[in-house]
Amino acid sequence: ATLYIGTVLLLLPMKMPYREESTAKDASPLSNLMEGMNYIFKKRVMFRLMLLNFVRTGVFAPLLLLLPAYTSEVLNAGPGIGTAMMVSMGIGGVTASFIMSSWGFFVRKGLVSLITLCTGSMVFTVLGLSSWVALSVGIMIIMGLSQSHFIVSNQTLVQKVVPDTLRGRVSSVWHYEQGLIPIFSLVIGLTAGLIGMGRAMTIYGAIAVLLGVMYLLIFKDIRELD
């Protein structure tokens, strides 16, 4: 909470020399949402960026919610191992933040989004196959690196592509996808109840890997974004 308050205080002295008059107040929230959705569906690059984030939300985001069941059923371990996995993921995320803030991206941001979607999905798949605690804990560092790089690169490209007048509307749609996390978690959980957590994670991870590789091959316009 202190860090959030500190961030807000640091934003207060910022000066914004350029600003366009907002048009959102002239319409209802629903019409603003529909306007953002229409823009996303009409502009192919934006739709593809949103699609990548949709897959990321469906695979990466539910992982933390699944850890208690995963550590108990797949690893036959206690809650301490789940905590260790979360810590490892946090280490990866902080490391990614340090790398991006210090040196930026070493390749184009669009390519970063596509590659990290694949690597994060691979981690999800490996976790489903793993029964080795050390592997499961260690590989979460890669998940943290992948997720942080994906979110920053994908969101940066969204902000770069969208016009100023629609930035708030489109960003809202991007964040609305976070509301789907409980649904994705429910689907994975129900599948795990039928075939086991390990198999469910392996299947969902493999599907995400296939989608990621397919997007990497066919989304040339995304690969070239920087």
Q: Predicted regions: what is each one?
A:
Residues 48-57, 174:
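Alpha-helical segments in transporter systems
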Residues 3-5, 34, 41, 60-226:
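C-terminal transmembrane bundle of multi-pass solute transporters/carriers
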Residues 17-51:
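Juxtamembrane intracellular "pre-TM" segments in multi-pass secondary transporters
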Residues 3-27, 217-226:
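Helix-loop junctions on the cytosolic side of multi-pass membrane transporters
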